């Protein structure tokens, strides 16, 4: 069972920061996809996913993050990932997604 998932979004100009709370897995990915779809349809081109409260990510969650990055790049935007927990960072490293996605240990400057 997934840890209670919720997503908080804060806008700062043309950048949206989405803080993921809980597990990003097959049960919760549709909620992330819906939120990203809403941001894209509103013209948001730069999204930062703050992972400090994300407790777990499975393959469907990784796929959703990769799909988000591809969609934004195709539209001329970008995706940044910040503050992953060590266990989540390790998953990105094991899957080589840390090289494919822009990931930062701390808040972006």
Language model features with spans:
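STAS-like cytosolic regulatory interaction modules
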Residues: 1-56, 67-109
């Amino acid at each position: 069972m997934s840890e209670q998932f919720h997503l908080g979004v804060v806008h700062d100009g043309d950048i949206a920061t989405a803080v993921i709370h809980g597990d990003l897995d097959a049960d919760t990915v549709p909620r992330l996809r819906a939120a990203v779809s809403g941001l894209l349809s509103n013209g948001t081109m730069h999204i930062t996913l703050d992972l400090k409260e994300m407790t777990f990510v499975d393959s469907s969650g990784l796929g959703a993050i990769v799909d988000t990055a591809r969609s934004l790049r195709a539209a001329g935007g970008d995706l940044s990932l910040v503050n992953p927990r060590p266990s989540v960072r390790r998953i990105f490293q094991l899957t080589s997604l840390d090289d494919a996605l822009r990931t930062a240990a701390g808040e972006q400057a």
